[in-house]
Amino acid sequence: MTDIVIVNGARTAMGGFQGSLASVTAPELGAACIKEAIARAGLQATDVEEVIMGCVLPAGLKQGPARQAMRQAGLPDSTGAVTINKLCGSGMKAVMQAADMIKAGSAEIVVAGGMESMTNAPYVLPKARGGLRMGHGEIKDHMFLDGLEDAETGRLMGSFAQDMANTRGYTREQMDDFAIRSLERAQKAVNEGYFADEIVPVTVSSRKGDIVVDKDEQPFNANIAKIPTLRPAFAKDGTITAANASSISDGASALVLTSADNAAAKGLKPLAKIVAYATNSQHPSEFTIAPVGAIQKVLNKTGWNAQDVDLWEINEAFAMVTMCPMDDFKLDPAKVNINGGACALGHPVGSSGSRIILTLIHALKRTGGKKGIATLCIGGGEATAVAIELL
């Protein structure tokens, strides 16, 4: 079977909650990435047969967010589109499904990624349709209800992370130190232009004129000196805070996939090949350590050991999520999230899975590495991982 390759990709800068991208919808963010990724790949819009975009918070976005994004990107009506929701793994699962489609012969060229405007997630009235007959009605936050809370218990994802941090013995100081390192790396990456080849600028119109958003917003909103003084977020005497957890964010990303044979036939120059991918699933309360199993499955499929991997992108939903596989696989901290992670950059939930693959590719290019693994935890007890190799 011919290899599946990533020809190119693009992402938006990540905006903070109610920040620089607040007026832009998820499909609009997705459209910018789809259009730019196709252009960077050296393809025409008519070459793409299918678009798969993750989106975790679709309420109020109107019919078919991926279809909207595809059409706004200028693709023809004959192009198929599907929106998928695997929570924080949506963008990565989109890439995995695209690879499966190409392997199966269902399509030759697929755009896959994710998009999210957490800022614009609406409030919902679950009982309004049947009639709020008497007394007080409850308004629920779509972001919390469908994104950040466990479906069975209603507990916030961070409360499970706090439990696991306690179980693993991670201290507040350890997690704060991790978050500070992530922030320092992210600030350096932005200042040095390390993300420039990833990002497609987004123009935001306002009464004050047009503003071009082309840099990640959140690394410069944080005050390192205040990190040790922040209050616990999920338990009175807890150790997880807003700083050593990921930020609520807006953003999108997209990758162009095809087979190595098709890329050669069309004269394309792929950036990387997908070597393996895997999903690991366990009890919902243990989602924060699920990446450990996903990584092991991918290592088994590739025949690599952890020390063969040049760089890692392990999504920082919480600092402790990344710390677990770092400890279990004895990873060199200098090889993990070298440009910072979600604690500093943000975590637009539908996009992060594809975003970290794109960031990993460019980090490998910049540092002269070849092999990389990207992974992230997923609410409900799951994780996905993708192993890539630069071409």
Ranges and model annotations:
Residues M1-L61, P65-A73, G80, F160-R172, ...:
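Conserved active-site "lid/cap" helical segment
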Residues A10-T12, S23-A32, R40, Q174-A265, ...:
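N-terminal extracellular/periplasmic Venus flytrap/periplasmic-binding protein-like
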Residues S159-Q162, E198, S205-S206, V275-A344:
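Active-site pocket-lining segment
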Residues C55-V110, A151-M157, N221-S247, D328-R355, ...:
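Conserved catalytic cysteine-centered active-site region
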Residues I109-D163:
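Flexible glycine-/small-residue-enriched beta->alpha junction loops
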Residues M1-T25, I139, A222-I289, G293, ...:
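Condensing-enzyme catalytic core mediating Claisen C-C bond formation in acyl metabolism
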Residues I84-E116, A165-Y194, A254-D261, M326, ...:
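Active-site-proximal alpha-helical scaffold in enzymes
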